Structure formats: C-alpha cells, structure tokens
Amino acid sequence: MFSFFRRKKKQETPALEEAQIQETAAKAESELAQIVENIKEDAESLAESVKGQVESAVETVSGAVEQVKETVAEMLSEAEEAAEKAAEQVEAAKEAVAETVGEAVGQVQEAVATTEEHKLGWAARLKQGLTKSRDKMAKSLAGVFGGGQIDEDLYEELETVLITSDMGMEATEYLMKDVRDRVSLKGLKDGNELRGALKEALYDLIKPLEKPLVLPETKEPFVIMLAGINGAGKTTSIGKLAKYFQAQGKSVLLAAGDTFRAAAREQLQAWGERNNVTVISQTTGDSAAVCFDAVQAAKARGIDIVLADTAGRLPTQLHLMEEIKKVKRVLQKAMPDAPHEIIVVLDANIGQNAVNQVKAFDDALGLTGLIVTKLDGTAKGGILAALASDRPVPVRYIGVGEGIDDLRPFDARAFVDALLD
C-alpha cells in the first residue's frame, strides 16, 4: 500500500519539473526577447544619436571649410590689393627717384658749370661773359688802337667799328663827338691813346642807365611786373631774381601770369620748387586774374616781393599789348600803387630791335627798368649804348650766363672795362 503511494509520487515529479522548465524557458524567452527588444531600441537610439552627431560634425566641418575658404579668399584678395598697392608705390618711388636724380644731376651740372665762375668773382665773370663782344671789337679796333697818328681816316675806322657793334647811329655820333673833344682837350696824338678816350666816353653815355633797384622798407608787398617777347628769358630771369632777393633776406611769391603757355607755368613751378618759393597759378583764366590773386595772397601772407610773369608778345600784336595794359590796371586794383616796378626783359642777341621793343613797351606800360639777358651769347654788346642814347630806361640787371647767380645789378664801369679792356 505504501509502495503504491510512493510510486505514484515518483510519477508526478517529472511532469512538474517539465512544467517548471517550460515556464522557466518561456520566462527566459520572454526576458530574452525583452532584452533583444531593449538592445534593438538602444541600438536604434544609438544609431540615431551617432547619425545626428555625425551629421552635426559634418555640418560643423562643412561650415569650417566654407569659413576657411572665405578667409583664404579674403586673404588672397587682400594680398592682391597689397601687391597692387606695393607695385604702385614702387612705380611712384621709381618716378620720384628718377625726378630727384634728374634734378640732382641738373643741379650738379649747373654747379660744375658755374663753380669756376663763382671763384672768379662777378667782374671776371662779366668779362668772361662779354668775350664774344669784346673779341669782335678787339679785332675791329686793332687797327685803330694799333698806333699811328690820329686823323680823319682813324676816326672813320672807329666810327665804322661802333656802328657794326650795334651801338646805333645816335650813340655812335655821340661817342665820336665825345672822343674828338677828349682828343682835342687832352692833346692826344697817338692811336694807342684813343682806347682810354673811348672807354670814358662810353662810360659817360651808359652811366645814367646804372640805377640799381632799391626796395623800400614797407609792410606791403613790392610788386614787380615783367614783360617781353617770347624767348627773351623772362621766366628764367624771374627764377634768378627770386634767388637774388632771397639772398637779401626777402620773402618772394611768384605769379604764373603767362597763361598762354603751359610750359611757362611748369617752368615757373620748377623755379619755385628750386627756390622753395610759392607759385600762384591757374590752369584756366587770364593773366590779370592770376596776378591779382598773387598780390592778394602776398598781402595775406606778409610776403615782401611779388614777381609777376606775363605772356610773351610782340609789340606789333596790338590785342596782346592791350591785354598787358589790363594786367597793369588789375594790379592797380589789387594795390593802388602797384605795380611798383615794370621791367621788360630783352635778349641782347636781337641787337637794334631791342630799342624798338623798349619804345613800344615803354609807350604802353611806362617802363621803370630793363633786364638785358644773354650778353654771353652775342657779339652785340654795344646795344646798351644804343638804349642809353635812344630810350634811356634804367638797366636794373644784366645776365651773362646760365647759372642761377649770373643775373646781377648793372654796373656801368664794370661793363665798359669788360667790353674794352
């Protein structure tokens, strides 16, 4: 009986265990499925997260790349601009250096050309400048001063020399009479003694032309108006006068009144830069307006001297002569007593034509002085005698060279000595 019950229990145990196993297996399977599901969800979540991070990283990298591209492009653009500016600066520097070198070379050449003349002194430089005129007269007068008795033949020979030296008929007649009187008064007999008589006669004739320009002590600008024909050396004389007045401690202002020639303005600007002097100019407008502005500027700045350039003109060009009269009138409006000095610049090479020019400009403007230039380039040094006889306007300055210091006040004694010694 008991064994029956025991056997029955043994039979029930495997079934129970199997159910438990199945239940455990099912539970494990469920848990495993849940784990797999969780893993799958985690994997998907991780994948999404990684994808987002990757996309974000890609976007960040792309943005960085674009930024780098933009930065590089900006840097390249700036580099190109800098290169262009550098190239422009290099070209400008080249031009500036070339200009500076050119000016320096010009100054050195001029300095070399004039160094010996400066060493000689003005009297010797004047004599050197009048070499052509002196040599011509010396050859012509060799027979006159070479000895022999003073007679009518000798006088006729002397008269011919004076006429061919551009002294003109009036001056020649005056000199011949004066020489005859001296010969008679002193009892001269020999041709060698005529030189001294001629020198004194010529000196007495041209001495009245020796009236140096005296600048008044005033607070107002002293206005000097310059006129003349083209090529006489007007603009160059203005540049030299500026240097001359500066050496006397005067402040100078230049008026580029030659509005017909652009080259004249440029030339005057160059002289202004060379002397560190202000130049008043206009690309348009007339000469009178430029000169008026220059005087106004000089008064405002306390300048001592105004040098007013005007356009070159022939006395026969009546409309241009009327224009230069207008310049004078406008200057008088700028300052009631201006221009204080009206100077005509004469080229000594034109000989007797200089007398006609002086007459025409004097009649039109009322000249106060003359500048005779280029005496070193002509054999017509006798022109001063003709001027003294026909129209004795004071010769303020004479020029005997290209150097900036080769324009000096006229000295009658030095001139005669340089011409006849």
UniProtKB/Swiss-Prot annotation:
InterPro entries: AAA+_ATPase, P-loop_NTPase, Signal_recog_particl_SRP54_hlx, SR_rcpt_FtsY, SRP/SRP_N, SRP54_GTPase_dom, SRP54_N_sf. GO terms for molecular function: ATP hydrolysis activity; GTP binding; GTPase activity; signal recognition particle binding. SMART domains: AAA, SRP54, SRP54_N. It is found in: Cell inner membrane; Cytoplasm. Keywords: Cell inner membrane, Cell membrane, Cytoplasm, GTP-binding, Hydrolase, Membrane, Nucleotide-binding, Receptor. It is an enzyme of class 3 (hydrolase). It comes from the Bacteria. PROSITE patterns: SRP54 (PS00300). It is a peripheral membrane protein. GTP binds at residues 228-235, 309-313, 373-376. One of its GO terms (cellular component) is cytoplasm. It catalyses: GTP + H2O = GDP + phosphate + H(+). GO terms for biological process: protein targeting; SRP-dependent cotranslational protein targeting to membrane. Its EC number is 3.6.5.4. Belongs to the GTP-binding SRP family. FtsY subfamily. Involved in targeting and insertion of nascent membrane proteins into the cytoplasmic membrane. Acts as a receptor for the complex formed by the signal recognition particle (SRP) and the ribosome-nascent chain (RNC). Interaction with SRP-RNC leads to the transfer of the RNC complex to the Sec translocase for insertion into the membrane, the hydrolysis of GTP by both Ffh and FtsY, and the dissociation of the SRP-FtsY complex into the individual components. Part of the signal recognition particle protein translocation system, which is composed of SRP and FtsY. SRP is a ribonucleoprotein composed of Ffh and a 4.5S RNA molecule. This is Signal recognition particle receptor FtsY. It comes from Neisseria meningitidis serogroup B (strain ATCC BAA-335 / MC58).
